[in-house]
Design a protein with these regions (language model features):
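Polybasic, low-complexity association/targeting segments
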Residues: 2-34
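Acidic-glycine-rich active-site phosphate/pyrophosphate-binding loop
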Residues: 10-21, 43-66, 135-139
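Active-site-proximal helix-loop elements at catalytic-domain edges
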Residues: 24-52
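A short glycine/serine-rich beta->alpha loop
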Residues: 26-33, 67-75, 146-151
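Short, contiguous, pocket-lining structural segments
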Residues: 34-38, 55, 76, 153, ...
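Amphipathic alpha-helical interface segments
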Residues: 39, 44-49, 87-88, 98-174
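FAD-binding core of FAD-dependent oxidoreductases
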Residues: 75-85
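DPxDG-like acidic metal-binding loop motif
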Residues: 83-93
C-alpha cells in the first residue's frame, strides 16, 4: 500500500490563533473506525461540501450505504472507490443527458481517480484488496472489533480514496 499521506495536517490562521484541520483521509479513517462502511466513510468525509449542494449528512450516508463491502458485501468494486465516485459526481458531475462532452469529461475524471487508487493500492476490486482475509459474500457484516480493524486495510483504503479525491478537488477548483 502507498505511503500514508493523510496524516498531513493542514494549518489555517484565523485572527491570532492557528487551527489544525484534519485531511479528508483522516476523517474517512475515523468515520470507518466509528462503524460507517467504507463507502460511507469516504462520502461523509466530504459532508460539508455535499451539504452545500443540498445533500444532508443523513442522505449522503444513505446513498453510500449500499456500496460497502464492494457493493453489499459482494466484494466487487471497493466501496471506498464507489464513495469517491459518488462524491465526485455530486460535486462535479453532469446532469444533462444530452451533454456528451460533459459526460466524457466526467468519465475521464472518474477513470483518473480510479487509476490513481489502483496505482497506489494494486487494485480497485474489494476481494483483491482483501486478499488473504475471509471475503465471503454473506450479507451479515462482521462485528467491528479491534481484531477486525487490525486485519483489514479498509480504514487505510478509505483514507487513501478520500485523500485522492481531496487532491483532485483542490487541483480542479474553479
Amino acid at each position: 500500500m502507498a505511503e500514508n499521506k493523510s496524516m498531513d495536517i493542514v494549518e489555517k490562521s484565523t485572527k491570532n490563533e492557528t487551527v489544525c484541520e484534519k485531511s479528508r483521509g483522516d476523517r474517512a479513517r475515523e468515520l470507518f473506525r466509528e462503524g460507517y462502511n467504507c463507502s460511507q466513510a469516504v462520502t461523509l468525509a466530504f459532508a460539508e461540501e455535499l451539504e452545500a449542494r443540498g445533500i444532508s449528512r443523513e442522505m449522503a450516508a444513505g446513498l453510500a450505504s449500499s456500496f460497502g463491502g464492494g457493493l453489499g458485501r459482494l466484494r466487487e468494486v471497493c466501496g471506498c472507490v464507489s464513495g469517491m465516485a459518488l462524491v465526485c459526481g455530486a460535486l462535479e458531475g453532469y446532469t444533462d443527458p444530452k451533454a456528451a462532452a460533459e459526460k466524457q469529461d466526467h468519465y475521464k475524471k472518474i477513470q483518473e481517480l480510479v487509476t490513481t487508487f489502483k496505482n497506489e493500492n494494486g487494485s480497485y476490486i474489494c476481494r483483491e484488496l482483501l486478499a488473504g482475509i475471509n471475503t465471503d459474500t454473506n450479507p451479515v457484516p462482521e462485528a467491528r472489533t479491534e481484531s477486525y480493524y487490525k486485519k483489514r486495510p479498509c480504514a487505510e483504503l478509505a483514507a487513501c480514496a478520500a485523500d485522492i479525491l481531496e487532491r483532485h478537488l483542490k487541483e480542479n477548483q474553479k
